[in-house]
């Protein structure tokens, strides 16, 4: 696919699609709640539609209209055995959280996905769930999908110190803990996104959060809700960076989710001297949302690492692009988790941006980016990773000497089906 190149800047207002993490979880909690859940501004992208498909296969009635998704909950014990394997496509969130949701059911399940999912590590979820009494294994006894879950296992409480900072692992344990006897205690390594915890409370459940320690009791009942999903800050990040690095730009992003566990990119933009203002903030779905305004800016390099990394892990590819347009060196460290995303994002970012003229060195746990560098025409690939594909489209906006051809552009539909249309709507 030939990407959009434009040196004239981007001007206008857009509303980014609903938050991907919250869209997944709204279906999951709606399914195990009693009564009806109505979800507005749901992310209708491949990953989240895969979650809907999986719960329909488990006997949950889900209606889809133009404006909303309506989930008719089965209650905490009402899921039914699927007729065949659950195919969750490309969604790491779906497979890992479903492992927790299905760990204590009275039926067997097989969960599989695409070739990317088949390469992603699952022991980080499987081992703590097995410690709770779940029986599950990967293909041929490995940790890789397809994952087979054996039913009719009683789950017991656990105190668990997480070895990695992962909201997916934490959420899988929480979902399993809801089916276990007693109180499960989870100690996080670093603070990660907390949508699951907040949604438990929103659906009428109880959970204690004290710093890095979470306590959740089993046997809880949930009540269906009406909710509006705020815009995904990870999707907004591409337009934030586009507005900062394309000369003459000013972009307003409305109804963006402002959960503090997700807004690390705002802190980085401030460190680098970028113009980013948040206004009109309000509560939506129990979460803060607001309008984010960005303008083209002169940027300087910075160092990014430590406990901010879980707050911006999905934004690192586009932050790396931002750093190519900053004066000086930017160092990103403590981000080895990038190696086990849809692709090895450390290598993918360095390989593809270097093709375009960037000066980036990959490291074991991050990137060293030397700026400021002009970007040039090239043939690039997304590696089938939606965030790499969208980052490369933003990079292409700076190219003046020819075309940028993107291979595997279809990956973008995993999280943002209207991405290219929204870019075009902002062209001067």
UniProtKB/Swiss-Prot annotation:
Gene3D superfamilies: Enolpyruvate transferase domain
Pathway in which this enzyme or protein is active: Metabolic intermediate biosynthesis; chorismate biosynthesis; chorismate from D-erythrose 4-phosphate and phosphoenolpyruvate: step 6/7
BP-aspect Gene Ontology terms: amino acid biosynthetic process; aromatic amino acid family biosynthetic process; chorismate biosynthetic process
Catalytic activity: 3-phosphoshikimate + phosphoenolpyruvate = 5-O-(1-carboxyvinyl)-3-phosphoshikimate + phosphate
UniProt lineage: Bacteria, Bacillati, Bacillota, Bacilli, Bacillales
Main location: cytoplasm
Function of the protein: Catalyzes the transfer of the enolpyruvyl moiety of phosphoenolpyruvate (PEP) to the 5-hydroxyl of shikimate-3-phosphate (S3P) to produce enolpyruvyl shikimate-3-phosphate and inorganic phosphate.
Keyword field: Amino-acid biosynthesis, Aromatic amino acid biosynthesis, Cytoplasm, Transferase
Alphabetical list of SUPFAM superfamilies matching this protein: EPT/RTPC-like
Protein origin, superkingdom: Bacteria
Binding site for phosphoenolpyruvate: 20, 92, 120, 168, 345, 387
Entry protein name: 3-phosphoshikimate 1-carboxyvinyltransferase
Keyword Cytoplasm: yes
Family under the similarity heading: Belongs to the EPSP synthase family.
PANTHER family, A to Z: AROM/DEHYDROQUINATE SYNTHASE, PENTAFUNCTIONAL AROM POLYPEPTIDE
Alphabetical list of CDD domains matching this protein: EPSP_synthase
UniProt-listed NCBIfam families: aroA
EC numbers for this chain: 2.5.1.19
GO terms assigned for molecular function: 3-phosphoshikimate 1-carboxyvinyltransferase activity
One cellular-component annotation, GO: cytoplasm
Assembly notes: Monomer.
HAMAP family: EPSP_synth
EC top class, as a word: transferase
Cellular compartments annotated: Cytoplasm
């Amino acid at each position: 696919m030939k990407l959009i190149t434009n040196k004239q800047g981007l001007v206008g207002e857009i509303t980014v699609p609903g938050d991907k993490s919250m869209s997944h979880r709204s279906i999951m909690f709606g399914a195990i709640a009693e009564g009806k859940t109505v979800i507005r501004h749901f992310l209708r992208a491949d990953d989240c539609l895969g979650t809907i498909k999986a719960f329909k296969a488990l006997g949950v009635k889900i209606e889809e209209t133009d404006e909303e998704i309506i989930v008719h909950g089965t209650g905490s014990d009402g899921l039914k055995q699927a007729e065949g394997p659950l195919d969750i496509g490309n969604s790491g969130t779906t497979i890992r959280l479903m492992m927790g949701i299905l760990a204590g059911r009275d039926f067997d399940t097989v969960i599989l996905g695409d070739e990317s999912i088949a390469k992603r590590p699952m022991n980080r979820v499987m081992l703590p769930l097995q410690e709770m009494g779940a029986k599950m294994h990967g293909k041929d006894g490995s940790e890789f999908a397809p994952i087979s879950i054996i039913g009719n296992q009683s789950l017991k409480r656990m105190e668990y110190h997480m070895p990695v900072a992962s909201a997916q692992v934490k959420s899988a344990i929480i979902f399993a803990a809801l089916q276990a006897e007693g109180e499960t205690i989870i100690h996080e390594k670093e603070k990660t996104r907390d949508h699951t915890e907040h949604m438990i409370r929103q659906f009428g459940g109880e959970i204690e959060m004290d710093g890095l320690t979470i306590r959740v009791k089993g046997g809880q009942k949930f009540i269906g809700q009406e909710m509006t999903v705020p815009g995904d800050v990870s999707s907004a990040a591409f337009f934030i960076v586009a507005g900062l690095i394309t000369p003459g730009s000013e972009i307003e992003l409305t109804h963006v989710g402002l959960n503090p566990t997700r807004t690390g990119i705002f802190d980085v933009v401030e460190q680098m001297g970028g113009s980013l203002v948040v206004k009109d903030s309000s509560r939506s779905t129990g979460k803060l949302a607001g309008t984010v305004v960005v303008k083209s800016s002169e940027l300087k390099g910075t160092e990014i690492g430590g406990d901010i990394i879980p707050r911006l892990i999905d934004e690192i590819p586009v932050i790396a692009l931002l750093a190519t347009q900053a004066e000086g060196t930017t160092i990103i460290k403590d981000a080895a988790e990038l190696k086990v995303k849809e692709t090895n994002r450390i290598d993918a970012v360095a390989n593809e941006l270097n093709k375009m003229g960037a000066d980036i060195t990959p490291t074991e746990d991050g990137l060293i980016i030397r700026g400021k560098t002009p970007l040039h025409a090239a043939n690039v690939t997304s590696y089938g990773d939606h965030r790499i594909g969208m980052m490369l489209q933003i990079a292409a906006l700076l190219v003046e000497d020819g075309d940028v051809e993107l291979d595997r552009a279809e990956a973008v539909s995993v999280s943002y089906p209207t991405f290219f249309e929204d870019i075009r709507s902002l062209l001067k």
